[in-house]
């Protein structure tokens, strides 16, 4: 009987160990897949002309092979209780400059950076003959995300043909934005505007940032992480 009990206990321990190993293997697989997806999204545009802005080309970026990143949906980001989320998209020239620095800072702090592809969820409005038209509806979870980020966000407005501001009636998540959550609370909210970032006069937003401006942004990221 004792041997039988020992055998059952051993089998239970083995099953639990196998479950833990399986979970870790699957987590590692997902992490690699997320890193590959993000890297492909950004690097596939290297040197390409932006079709919606002819004459301007996406700068080449190279994301490290060993980046620690987790892709989130808008709803997952809205439900975040612990971690740091980068909101951006590959065709955003500001994101192409900022994301490598954010990944670098996260790696230096031993953290995994979460990434939410903002262009897949953010709604888009336009003015046609000064009439407000919804061009792209909000994706699942986007309005929950607006509610979660709350007072940190600026109103979403457009400008009509007479130069008047036209409010959309909701807030706007601009790219890039970084939000840090701790113990269920939003503890840090980062945008380029908030840190006083400006390009030198005449520099294209598509161009790589100077060492001075990279250093400025890197320092804010290091403090955040």
Predicted regions and their residues:
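N-terminal leader/targeting and pre-domain segments
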Residues: 7, 12-80, 200-225
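Extracellular/periplasmic catalytic domains that process cell-envelope and extracellular macromolecules
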Residues: 77-79, 107, 170-174
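Short active-site neighborhood of thiol/selenol oxidoreductases, capturing the structured segment around
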Residues: 78-92, 102
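Loop/turn elements at helix/coil->beta-strand transitions in domains of secreted/extracellular proteins
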Residues: 80-83, 109-114, 182
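Thiol-based oxidoreductase modules, predominantly thioredoxin-like and allied folds used
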Residues: 87, 110-161
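The canonical Cys-X-X-Cys-His
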Residues: 92-96, 178
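Typically the conserved alpha-helix immediately C-terminal to a functionally engaged Cys/Sec
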Residues: 95-109
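Non-catalytic, surface beta->alpha helical segment in thiol-disulfide oxidoreductase systems
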Residues: 167-225
